[in-house]
């Protein structure tokens, strides 16, 4: 999987496929019709970073994970949304810091926040902008990963 080239869509589809083999949840991957697809190197940091966020969506979703990929002539973006409870308000402004733990939360789904911290750090070191927020269209969490195409092509 590593040290070849592929498109963002292929990155995401390969990661989603690995989760579909072990998860009962439904993954819905959509590609913008305007997508300007180009190949980029398969880097372990990108694989782990994207995988961490898709894994979190799988962990906290009730039934579905929505992934939207789009690229125009300037930017490329992966949006990952779930239908879970979303980020607790008490940690929302601290998402991405290590060891963040919510005071509120499902006891079965507690974590130290290291997955988000690691995923965000790996992607940002590869010139991505990562935004973690509660979804504006669904009940759950949303992660938006954006690159300038010039940065993505020069990884």
Locations of the language-model features?
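Short beta-strand/loop element within the Bergerat-fold HATPase_c
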Residues: 64-74
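Acidic ATP/Mg2+-coordinating residue in the GHKL
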Residues: 82
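Short beta-to-alpha transition helix within the HATPase_c
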Residues: 3-21, 25, 49-51
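Conserved short strand/loop->alpha-helix "switch" segment adjacent to the catalytic nucleotide/phosphoryl-transfer site
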Residues: 30-49
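Conserved glycine-/histidine-rich ATP-lid loop and adjacent helix of the Bergerat-fold HATPase_c
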Residues: 118-127
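Short conserved segment of the HATPase_c
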Residues: 87-100, 104
